[in-house]
Amino acid sequence: MDSMKDKIRQALVELDIQATEEQIEQWLEYLKLLEKWNKVYNMTAIKKIDDMLVKHLFDSLAVAKYIKGSSTVDVGTGGGLPGVVLAILYPQHQFTLVDSVGKKIMFLKNVKKSLGLDNINPLNIRIENLNGSFDNIISRAFSSVDTFYELCKHFLTKDNQMLAMKGPDLEEQNLVSLPLDIEKHSIKVPFLNAERNLIVMRKK
């Protein structure tokens, strides 16, 4: 466990993120819960906690600096990625975690209780049926960017942003058709030798 903590500390240095020992403990506790529930409920294709550390925790932390304001909706959150990871980092920021799969929301309610995360609100709802206003609308491995936009455009204002976490495929053909200002950021994930990108979309 200490070696995992050391790896987290090293990743935080690489990402230029300040975090307390308590937050590091919370991230590890979250991953342990995810690993445990995964054995029964198939929450994620990644089975081993060592792999989750890099492909889930560090991947989520790598976009932390792009989160603005005080509220975020995590669309198709699954096991709480990136929402739970970022909620631990930003305790003053409110995260609404949305998924249409009931067992995943059941897991997230367990995470909320176990870790005492008062700033997450897990909702078993389809995103197109959710109302509200958010500074960030984020998704990780949820859908194509054009589908993401179609399902979430009712949230978009001139003051907020949509963030799509992506692998190497930037979906240029889909981005061209969107009536949005688009920024593409190459994301370096500690200990991960794979191309990761963040697409930030704002109203023109």
From Swiss-Prot:
It catalyses: guanosine(527) in 16S rRNA + S-adenosyl-L-methionine = N(7)-methylguanosine(527) in 16S rRNA + S-adenosyl-L-homocysteine. GO terms for molecular function: rRNA (guanine-N7-)-methyltransferase activity. Signal peptide: none annotated. Keywords: Cytoplasm, Methyltransferase, rRNA processing, S-adenosyl-L-methionine, Transferase. Transmembrane segments: none annotated. InterPro entries: rRNA_ssu_MeTfrase_G, SAM-dependent_MTases_sf. S-adenosyl-L-methionine binds at G76, L81, I127, E128, R140. It is found in: Cytoplasm. It comes from the Bacteria. Gene3D superfamilies: Vaccinia Virus protein VP39. Its EC number is 2.1.1.170. Its main location: cytoplasm. It is an enzyme of class 2 (transferase). Pfam families: GidB (PF02527). One of its GO terms (cellular component) is cytosol. Specifically methylates the N7 position of guanine in position 527 of 16S rRNA. NCBIfam families: rsmG_gidB. Belongs to the methyltransferase superfamily. RNA methyltransferase RsmG family. PANTHER family: S-ADENOSYL-L-METHIONINE-DEPENDENT METHYLTRANSFERASES SUPERFAMILY PROTEIN (PTHR31760:SF0). This is Ribosomal RNA small subunit methyltransferase G. The lineage of its organism: Bacteria, Pseudomonadati, Pseudomonadota, Gammaproteobacteria, Thiotrichales.
